[in-house]
From Swiss-Prot:
Protein name, per record: 6,7-dimethyl-8-ribityllumazine synthase
Species of provenance: Geobacter sp. (strain M21)
UniProt-recorded Gene Ontology molecular function terms: 6,7-dimethyl-8-ribityllumazine synthase activity
Name of encoding gene: ribH
Reaction equation(s) it catalyzes: (2S)-2-hydroxy-3-oxobutyl phosphate + 5-amino-6-(D-ribitylamino)uracil = 6,7-dimethyl-8-(1-D-ribityl)lumazine + phosphate + 2 H2O + H(+)
Role summary: Catalyzes the formation of 6,7-dimethyl-8-ribityllumazine by condensation of 5-amino-6-(D-ribitylamino)uracil with 3,4-dihydroxy-2-butanone 4-phosphate. This is the penultimate step in the biosynthesis of riboflavin.
């Protein structure tokens, strides 16, 4: 009979780090509210949550790698918004941020959730930060709660 491992949605006893980009802060703050709501609803102790604000999305991956490598966190949540403008800047930033966040997780073995919105318009970002399309910060927190518990089961 195989052993099945499936993460529980229980944040009790886990330590979380949240990195939020300040650029497009109206969106980032809504994503942060969603992430904190999910963590606290699922039993996280707010004293075990560290929120780090960085200038923008581009600074998120390095901060995530530093935090993940510290050994102080069971999981991290990366939040922010990159909104397309009239130059190719969006393409460069969104690509490097997504690669960097994935690298931080793979290099350290710490679950790191990608809650950085990459949208064409401010309206799309607002929809994903707590209106029509839910709150992607909440969703990112739910993901890391589950994966952190999967990793605990695998030890």
């Amino acid at each position: 009979m195989p052993k099945y491992v499936e993460g529980k949605l229980n944040a009790e006893g886990l330590k979380f780090g949240i990195i939020v980009g300040r650029f497009n802060s109206f969106i980032g703050e809504r994503l942060l509210e969603g992430a904190l709501d999910a963590l606290l609803r699922h039993g996280a102790d707010d004293a075990q949550i560290t929120v780090v604000r960085v200038p923008g999305a581009f600074e998120i991956p390095l901060t995530a790698q530093k935090m993940a490598g510290s050994g102080n966190y069971d999981a991290l949540i990366c939040l922010g918004a990159v909104i397309r403008g009239s130059t190719p800047h969006f393409d460069y930033v969104s690509s490097e941020v997504s690669k960097g966040i994935a690298h931080a997780s793979l290099a350290t073995g710490v679950p790191v959730a990608f809650g950085v919105l990459t949208t064409d318009t401010i309206e799309q970002a607002i929809e994903r930060a707590g209106t029509k399309a839910g709150n992607k910060g909440f969703d990112a927190a739910m993901t890391v709660i589950e994966i952190a518990n999967v990793f605990k089961e695998m030890k």
